[in-house]
């Protein structure tokens, strides 16, 4: 994803472009860091950083280019942007977080094009926001395979933000009442921003 592009800048004032790499090739699948001993968490975080650096090296030296060549040697990490010594992120991106047990749980049947057999997602009277993205699940530490399913423009129902048993607690981002499958379209940043 391009974070900073040259297009909006006047000629001669263009900054170096900045991109975020969030590809399945960069997904660390050898273990998770939830509810693990500090030593195990440190091990997995270090291995994930090593994977990121390996992918970056491949991009610089071996990635196929449109002109038939290989490698993009002009790519470099940006410690000044990321605020880290190596230019990698400060923390890993957790694609699927823990979710609340909500008063309402969004499922694939509410938003999936094929599952609905319709051109419209379910209409929620208590909608607090909208979103639109495919149901996109990357492989996981459980060795689940990649899933990419069409979804429909959907709403964020308030009931998915209200826990069953807790008071004075609202979820943020990916923590709403959704299933593993429906989380694949509710987890995207624009939808997270709508959730809060």
Q: Whereabouts are the PLM-identified features?
A:
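Flavin (FAD/FMN)-binding glycine-rich loop and adjacent Rossmann-like elements that form
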Residues: 1-194
């Amino acid at each position: 994803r391009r974070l900073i592009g040259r297009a909006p800048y006047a000629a001669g004032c263009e900054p170096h472009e900045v991109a975020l790499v969030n590809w399945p090739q960069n997904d660390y699948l050898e273990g998770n860091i939830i509810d693990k001993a500090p030593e195990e968490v440190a091990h997995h975080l270090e291995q994930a950083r090593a994977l990121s650096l390996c992918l970056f090296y491949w991009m610089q030296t071996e990635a196929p280019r449109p002109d038939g060549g290989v490698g993009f040697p002009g790519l470099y990490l940006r410690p000044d942007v990321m605020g880290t010594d190596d230019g990698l992120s400060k923390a890993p991106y957790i694609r699927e977080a823990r979710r609340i047990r909500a008063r309402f749980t969004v499922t694939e049947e509410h938003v999936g094009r094929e599952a609905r057999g319709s051109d419209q997602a379910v209409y929620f009277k208590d909608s607090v926001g909208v979103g639109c993205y495919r149901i996109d699940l990357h492989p996981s530490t459980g060795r689940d395979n990649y899933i990419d399913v069409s979804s429909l423009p959907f709403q964020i129902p308030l009931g998915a933000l209200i826990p069953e048993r807790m008071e004075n607690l609202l979820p943020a981002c990916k923590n709403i009442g959704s299933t593993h499958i429906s989380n694949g379209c509710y987890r995207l940043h624009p939808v997270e921003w709508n959730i809060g």
